[in-house]
Amino acid sequence: MMTEHVLILSAYLFSIGIYGLITSRNMVRALMCLELILNAVNLNLVTFSDLFDSRQLKGDIFSIFVIAIAAAEAAIGPAIVSSIYRNRKSTRINQSNLLNK
């Protein structure tokens, strides 16, 4: 019963993240939605790792790697967004095509 609730929560978080990525026009909001997606994936990894084989921590260890990648993305992403804002004076995704320059 608890596993079903966790998986429903994970699917809900993933759906919110995908919806936000599709509809968002702001880069900061898109980064936040990407973090929601990564957290939903981590929740699934830990849940299925505990469900199928609780003695081996493969899902937990992989989840730690995903958290490390998300931390790097959380550090580098806003720096890139602020750099684009300084050059383009906008954080809107449709106005930040850097190939047109």
UniProtKB/Swiss-Prot annotation:
Question: From what superkingdom does this record's organism come?
Answer: Eukaryota
Main location class? plastid
Subunit record text: NDH is composed of at least 16 different subunits, 5 of which are encoded in the nucleus.
For this protein, the parts annotated as crossing the membrane are 2-22, 32-52, 61-81
Give a short account of what the protein does.
NDH shuttles electrons from NAD(P)H:plastoquinone, via FMN and iron-sulfur (Fe-S) centers, to quinones in the photosynthetic chain and possibly in a chloroplast respiratory chain. The immediate electron acceptor for the enzyme in this species is believed to be plastoquinone. Couples the redox reaction to proton translocation, and thus conserves the redox energy in a proton gradient.
Q: What would be one Pfam family of this protein? A: Oxidored_q2
| Keywords, in A-Z order | Chloroplast, Membrane, NAD, NADP, Plastid, Plastoquinone, Quinone, Thylakoid, Translocase, Transmembrane, Transmembrane helix, Transport
Gene Ontology CC: one annotated term: NADH dehydrogenase complex
Q: Which organism is it from?
A: Liriodendron tulipifera
Q: What is this protein called?
A: NAD(P)H-quinone oxidoreductase subunit 4L, chloroplastic
- What GO molecular-function term can you cite, just one? quinone binding
The UniProt catalytic activity note for this protein reads: a plastoquinone + NADH + (n+1) H(+)(in) = a plastoquinol + NAD(+) + n H(+)(out); a plastoquinone + NADPH + (n+1) H(+)(in) = a plastoquinol + NADP(+) + n H(+)(out)
Subcellular localization(s) per the UniProt record:
Plastid, Chloroplast thylakoid membrane
Top-level class of the enzyme under EC nomenclature: translocase
- Name the membrane topology term: Multi-pass membrane protein
Cell membrane listed as a keyword: no
The record's comment on protein family reads: Belongs to the complex I subunit 4L family.
EC number(s) per entry: 7.1.1.-
Biological process (GO) annotations?
ATP synthesis coupled electron transport; photosynthesis, light reaction
